Amino acid sequence: MIKLPVLLADINIQSLPTEPELILNNLAITTLVENLIILLLVATLVALVARWLKIPYVIGLVLAGLAIPRGLSVGLNPELILNFFLPILIFEAAINTDISRLRSTIKPITVLAGPGVVISAAITAVLLKIGLGLAWVTAAGVSVILTITDTVSVIAAFRSVPVPRRLATIVEGESMLNDGVAMVLLSVITTIHIQGGFSAGEGIRQIFVAFVGGGLVGLGLGYLCVGLFRQLNDDLSDILLTVSVSLGTFQIGQMLGVSSAIAVVVAGLVIGNLALKQTSASIKVTLLSFWEYAGFGVNTLIFLLVGIEVYPSILLSTIPAALIAIVAYQIGRVFSIYPLLYLLSFFDRPLPLRWQHVLIAGNVKGSLSMALALALPLTLPGRDQVVTLVFSTVMVSLIGQGLSLPWVVKKLQLSKPSPLAQKIAMLQLNLVTAKAAQGELKYLLEAGSLPKFLYEELFADYQARIANSEQELREFYNQRNLIFSEGEVEKKYIDGLYRRLYIAEKSAINDALAKGILADDISDEYLQVLNEKLLALQDD
């Protein structure tokens, strides 16, 4: 049995704020602003490097954070994490979830996010108790925290390698719901720690009240928000309203003693599927863009700051414990995926075995796990060790599992492109390469490095390739109904082209408005049409 080393003397716990006297109170406001500016610039640079290296953005943030001097830290306040960051992450996932897509996958999602989380957490807790010698209540808390899946990393892998839409929906839906389930279980474990235990009946009652009460609070506030949406009909006011609802729902849930996470999830689903459908297309685009940015910003700060807060030497010393934790929660995941989905196949459409492999390989940990670790009560035995263990486990998971996930998904060949998709891709490749070659020919001609007769001959050859490719693509476009019936890959190709064109049109209109070239009334009408077309592409 490997004992988790006592890190209290090694890691500067002041860097993981556990007292009211936080780093934020010790830094001058000007220094804090300067640090934030530097961190934002670092995050921007990381995004560019991650795109160039073709690695997930969040992994780049963590690695960059490890290299950043600790003097740039702005502190990680547990109260800020719990009451501000968590509601934003949960609400952003919920407001972007289409209930109509969830209906067809509700059974596997419910099984995985309900009994699946309980089984996985129980097995993980036993293995952590045996492998790391943690106290039972501590092992239970860590196991629940590590049942949460990082949707950001998984969806990033799905974008690089196309997967069936139903699988993506299951992953997103399970991740959204198991956040709430994990927080309820963590609340029960915390209560057991504080009270010294209670009966099984009392535990079931608490869980029931947390789920049902949270759902009712979310429904009530969500429907109230729907009514206010009808009255406001203004994008900026609607943004303020949704921010108030997301943060306020979380606080009300805590005050009433119900699941704040479930309340925020339900409120987000109601607003995203009822309120937004009653607003104009431009308001909907603005709102969804705002929440996409909010979620992106929170994830950026959490991953970057966590990388700063953990000493590389401490991370290296806790890698053995982190590897044990990863093995433990992966074993728990195996026993919650294969048996449950096998039993479910008798009552619902079976999930292919390759999909189940992805659900296990995609069991990557992320920002929510770290946020919950920071929000643990200060009196929990070994809390400082737990925080360090969770941080190290998340980092190893992101780097190891996060980098390997796209390769695993590609090897499983979940969505083979049809011959038609391959043909379209080849024609597009011909267009790109031929036009690039023509551009180089023009440059050589103007520089005097190429005779004109040779330029004309070579240019004509490439022009013939372009003409042939464009003719074949035009024929595919004229048969677009056939293309759509071939599968989602081809439709995504056409939709992607339209989306880029519509965005280019919007950009041109906004530039013209800024220069006073176009009238506001006519431009607003056309922008509304473009927004509706963009939303139609998203809804397909």
From Swiss-Prot:
UniProt-annotated location(s): Cell membrane
InterPro entries for the chain: Cation/H_exchanger_CPA1, Cation/H_exchanger_TM, Na+/solute_symporter_sf
Protein's GO biological process: potassium ion transmembrane transport; regulation of intracellular pH; sodium ion import across plasma membrane
Species the sequence originates in: Synechocystis sp. (strain ATCC 27184 / PCC 6803 / Kazusa)
GO cellular component, one term: plasma membrane
Gene null: resulting phenotype: Mutant cannot grow at low sodium concentrations and exhibits an increased sensitivity towards potassium.
One Pfam family it belongs to: Na_H_Exchanger
PANTHER family hit by this protein: NA(+)_H(+) ANTIPORTER NHAS2, SODIUM/HYDROGEN EXCHANGER
Keyword Transport: yes
Protein name per the record: Na(+)/H(+) antiporter NhaS2
